């Protein structure tokens, strides 16, 4: 059994994203999000420990830009990243996005 390493609550989302690594610029979908990191559903894989730049499209228009380190990958499915060096403004936007997603999930469950 693996030890749970997550430090922040995650929410399920479906947000279009683009990411750029050392050798590639690719697209995918963020399907799991927290203030600490996310999982990107994509057939294009980054290397573990690779630093990537992530652009996540917001449901209200615009985008948020984040840097993260790949912490694990699942072949032909995607990879998880841990955010690094998030500015205060980006963290605030990330928290708003998570609150928005959490509210949508609660209204569906009700």
Task: Walk through the language-model features, giving the residues of each.
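C-terminal structural segments of small proteins and small subunits
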Residues: 73-101
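N-terminal helix initiation/capping motif
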Residues: 1-33, 95-110
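Short, charged beta-turn/beta-strand-edge "cap" motif at the junction between a beta-strand
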Residues: 57-62
